[in-house]
């Protein structure tokens, strides 16, 4: 340990081994690598997500030759000892013996990455996030550059000691690894960072739609680079759209506060009748909450004045009207041109009643019904839809407190009417909990082992109190779709747990098994619907579309992780094919439209709602867009939909090739409509979908994809700016023309709102000034579990969603989301 180098014998000398500087893929193909992360070759050939470097390339000599090795200077040695550059983490404290073995974080090789479920996401994310937050003084000029060893440099005692400590930690880690594997052989344990993606305030699981968008690294790199390069035009458009959306949000917030003071106000009776009928024929026919005959009886008594109306019923009626008005898309029925403001006021009023102290009816079946209506209204009217998962936890606990999770057969004295109402309500509670957990990418709060409540009987509401004999399964009733959903609930819950679990990591055979069970359940539902007797009532288009959405979305989420790896591994080709076919099935909808029905009911919901009615379609659009791009760029195989899932969509080969492109362009047009008059101002998704279309067109013509993506982003932002200006002007004009609101007693109540204090239309055209600080990407850091802490430089209030994905810098996407007050701004 005197620091002098020990000369090696002549017989023990070996050839000088040059350090490995190229990435793994370029080194195997023996081509020149520019040593970037990712390198230009991997980025050009579509392997950016798997561009990795050999971490321990400079320590390949035997242990006995360690004192004679040439090393770098101490600063560079400490830089390369980072977990992203070496196999082990170097302890920073003096207590070397107290360094826990868990700090040793080996970087998996490419083979290990493909063999694991989400290791590619973990490796690239870990590499980029660590290099981003590393001290600039210890960062090489090039990210992929590893300094060469020079003969003039000699190892110091500290360097030799550090190397010895590394070897000891490796030995301790290798000795403890078999013990942990024997303790839990059925659970594949891994780094927690590999199981989830962390943002500033949100933890997204594998069922979130942003996971699929991680494949479009070209789009995100191009837009991020343009923002960071101070592109005046692009940044100015970005600022104007952002500030306009905030101004619209303030106007909606002002209106909601004013309308909330109008207690008991309702639209006209004619408008209420249309909205109530729309709700009963759509959502109430699939997600059973109310007993329709009883509800209509009290509703008619309210207008005639024969019986006093309770506050609880009025709250239910307001939410039913809000949902029905969204279905029929007639906002003028609610007495205001801005339906979102009135829906927000009604939702806030119902939530205040649910959380008010001293309300004994909260812990009752009526209270559970109101709670379900509140959550459904938030989803349909895009009011805090991304936070519904948090509220479903309280709903589930209230339902369990009432014993809805236990089958009514355990209570012999309970009437048949009450027993069936409880079964229907429990089915709806389970569905809301499961769907909201999938939207947010979090583990489901329910387990099939924790309840024994059976599905409801196949009875109509009119026969519920007169007979207990259910109808045959081929007779459509008001509970037929609830029975179908409850039948496939166990496999869907299992899929949701597999996707968003922290500890369990399923094998591909397990995914195939779950996919087979889920596909069989979907096919069973299809066969049951086809077997409905033609002499009785037939299912509506809304019922068919909603049933497909609630079931097929789990099949898409289940195969999505392996479909992303199918481009490099043929073993996952089946997942890629299933994802494409399921995505087309979700986007295209039911191939035939039943005659004599309201065909626009579901289209209006899909156009204006959020959460459940937006996220699955975004994931399906991203899946279809990536498949089209792969085929256009000359991928090694083409994945055409030919299975029974889409056989109704493609009768000829030429038509089959056009179906993915058609459904993708249709949804891009639908997202543009959401900007114009939707409750949620969703700028981010519209810009990203437009960039996907532009990248596909550029790949078809052979033009540069970066230029096409940037041009599409600018054009889409300009269109967003025009739309938002029109919306703001219409809001300003409507403030001067109050709309009459009718109380159920018959009086008119005028509503007039004052002007706001800020005129956002006078925005600086150059985007300079205070707006530049709104999206300073240099001040945002990443929180990845406990490894990084949010510093005071982070602007959490301005960044509604901070997402870090493998090999991507999502700082650009964080502010591309603006909603009306209470609408989702975190799941975009």
UniProtKB/Swiss-Prot annotation:
It is found in: Nucleus. Gene3D superfamilies: Zn(2)-C6 fungal-type DNA-binding domain (4.10.240.10). GO terms for biological process: DNA-templated transcription. Residues 1-20 are annotated as: Disordered. Disruption phenotype: Results in significantly reduced expression of the leporins biosynthesis gene cluster. The keyword Transport does not apply. This is Transcription factor lepE. Keywords: DNA-binding, Metal-binding, Nucleus, Transcription, Transcription regulation, Zinc. It holds the Pfam family Zn_clus. One of its GO terms (cellular component) is nucleus. Transcription factor involved in regulation of gene cluster 23 that mediates the biosynthesis of leporins. The keyword Nucleus applies. Signal peptide: none annotated.
């Amino acid at each position: 340990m005197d620091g002098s180098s020990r000369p090696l014998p002549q017989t023990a000398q070996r050839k000088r081994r040059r350090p490995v500087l190229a990435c793994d893929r370029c080194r195997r193909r023996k081509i020149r690598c520019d040593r970037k992360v990712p390198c230009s070759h991997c980025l050009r050939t579509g392997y950016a997500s798997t561009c990795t470097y050999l971490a321990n390339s400079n320590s390949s000599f035997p242990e006995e030759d360690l004192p004679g090795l040439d090393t770098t200077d101490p600063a560079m040695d400490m830089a390369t000892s980072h977990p992203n550059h070496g196999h082990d983490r170097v302890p920073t404290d003096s207590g070397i013996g107290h360094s826990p073995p868990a700090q040793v974080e080996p970087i998996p090789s490419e083979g290990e990455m493909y063999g694991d479920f989400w290791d590619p996401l973990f490796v690239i994310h870990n590499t980029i996030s660590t290099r981003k937050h590393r001290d600039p003084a210890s960062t090489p000029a090039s990210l992929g550059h590893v300094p060469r060893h020079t003969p003039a440099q000699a190892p110091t005692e500290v360097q030799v000691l550090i190397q010895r400590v590394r070897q000891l930690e490796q030995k301790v880690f290798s000795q403890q690894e078999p013990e942990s594997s024997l303790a839990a052989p059925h659970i594949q344990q891994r780094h927690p960072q590999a199981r989830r993606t962390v943002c500033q305030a949100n933890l997204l699981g594998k069922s979130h739609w942003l996971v699929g968008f991680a494949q479009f690294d070209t789009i995100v790199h191009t837009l991020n680079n343009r923002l960071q390069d101070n592109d005046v035009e692009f940044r100015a458009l970005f600022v104007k759209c952002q500030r306009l959306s905030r101004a619209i949000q303030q106007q909606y917030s002002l209106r909601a506060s004013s309308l909330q003071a109008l207690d008991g106000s309702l639209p006209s009776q004619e408008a209420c009748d249309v909205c109530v009928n729309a709700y009963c024929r759509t959502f109430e026919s699939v997600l059973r909450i109310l007993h329709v005959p009883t509800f209509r009886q009290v509703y008619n008594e309210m207008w005639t004045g024969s019986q006093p109306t309770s506050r609880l019923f009025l709250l239910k009626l307001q939410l039913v009207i809000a949902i029905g008005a969204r279905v029929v898309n007639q906002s003028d029925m609610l007495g205001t041109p801005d339906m979102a403001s009135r829906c927000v006021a009604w939702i806030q009023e119902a939530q205040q009643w649910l959380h008010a102290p001293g309300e004994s009816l909260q812990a009752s079946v009526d209270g559970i019904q109101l709670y379900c209506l509140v959550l459904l209204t938030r989803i349909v009217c895009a009011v805090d839809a991304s936070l519904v998962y948090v509220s479903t936890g309280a709903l589930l606990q209230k339902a369990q407190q009432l014993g809805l999770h236990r089958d009514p057969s355990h209570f012999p004295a309970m009437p048949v009417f009450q027993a069936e109402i409880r079964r229907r309500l429990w089915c709806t509670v389970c569905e809301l909990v499961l769907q909201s957990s999938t939207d947010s990418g979090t583990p489901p709060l329910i387990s099939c082992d924790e309840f024994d409540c059976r599905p409801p009987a196949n009875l109509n509401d009119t026969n519920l109190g007169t007979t207990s004999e259910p109808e045959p399964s081929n007779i459509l009733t008001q509970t037929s779709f609830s029975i179908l959903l409850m039948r496939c609930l166990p496999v869907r819950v299992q899929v949701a747990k597999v996707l968003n679990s922290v500890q369990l990591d399923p094998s591909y055979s397990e995914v195939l098994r779950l996919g087979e069970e889920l596909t069989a359940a979907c096919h069973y539902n299809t066969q049951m619907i086809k077997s409905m007797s033609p002499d009785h009532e037939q299912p509506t288009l809304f019922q068919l579309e909603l049933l497909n959405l609630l079931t097929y979305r789990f099949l898409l989420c289940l195969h999505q992780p392996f479909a992303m790896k199918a481009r490099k591994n043929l073993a996952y080709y089946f997942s890629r094919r299933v994802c494409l076919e399921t995505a087309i099935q979700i986007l295209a909808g039911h191939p035939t439209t039943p005659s004599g029905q309201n065909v626009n009911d579901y289209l209006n919901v899909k156009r204006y709602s959020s959460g459940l009615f937006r996220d699955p379609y975004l994931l399906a659009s991203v899946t279809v867009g990536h498949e089209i791009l792969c085929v256009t760029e000359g991928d090694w195989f083409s994945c055409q939909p030919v299975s029974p899932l889409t056989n109704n969509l493609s009768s000829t080969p030429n038509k089959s090739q056009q179906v993915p492109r058609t459904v993708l362009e249709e949804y891009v047009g639908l997202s543009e409509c959401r900007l114009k008059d939707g409750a949620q101002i969703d700028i981010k998704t519209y810009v990203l979908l437009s960039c996907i279309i532009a990248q596909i067109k550029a790949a078809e013509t052979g033009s540069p994809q970066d230029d096409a993506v940037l041009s599409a982003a600018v054009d889409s932002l300009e269109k967003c700016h025009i739309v938002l200006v029109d919306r703001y002007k219409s809001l300003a004009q409507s403030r001067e023309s109050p709309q009459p609101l009718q109380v159920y007693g018959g009086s008119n109540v005028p509503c007039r709102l004052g002007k706001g204090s800020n005129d956002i239309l006078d925005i600086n055209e150059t985007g300079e000034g205070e707006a530049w600080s709104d999206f300073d990407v240099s001040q945002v850091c990443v929180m990845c579990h406990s490894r990084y802490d949010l510093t005071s430089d982070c602007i959490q209030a301005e960044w509604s969603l901070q997402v870090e994905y493998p090999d991507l810098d999502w700082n650009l996407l964080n502010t591309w989301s603006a909603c009306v007050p209470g609408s989702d701004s975190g799941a975009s």
